[in-house]
């Protein structure tokens, strides 16, 4: 006799989430390595505009800053790791602010003072910042080192490196001194606006995933994928450093 009370198992629609997250991380890195020589690459059209511009061009530089952040693979991967286990808006705001402060300081100071280092090395460190955050999310420091770095300080420090990487790249464009400071401020404002837009999209996606049982089950796999992406970026930059 057929059991009419039997209910078919519900499909686990979210079981592919960590795989999708990993594919996204790896796809971003492959696209970055194929399309850019450096993690802070700038589109050819934007390069020409930056090099030829003179005078205060507030809104165009706001647009360029926002575009850089939204298409910045390294920034997005690092920030995804930062907010991975943050649930309260207060905590997210604190960490994002720490990153933004660090990014702003070195972006402005690096260009205005002319301090410059090898861009490959800076971008390799930025790749390792992604590895660090993924390892931190996995509890690796406490398990293997017996020491837990201060997450807020680490976010500020890596924000300094992220900003310095962009400052190093911008200095290659021989920016006009006419309107330089207002344009840099506008660019930085655009970066922060782009960061808000990118984080909003990430938070919406993460919010849906966190409500499912698969989040805790597959968080480890997702952070391993994030770590692999960071190693790929760092390895690519070191290859460029030794072969350029």
Q: What name fits each language-model region?
A:
Residues 68-73, 78-243:
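Hydrophobic alpha-helical transmembrane segments in multi-pass membrane proteins
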Residues 2-71, 147, 238-244:
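Histidine-/acidic- and/or cysteine-rich, low-complexity loops and terminal segments associated
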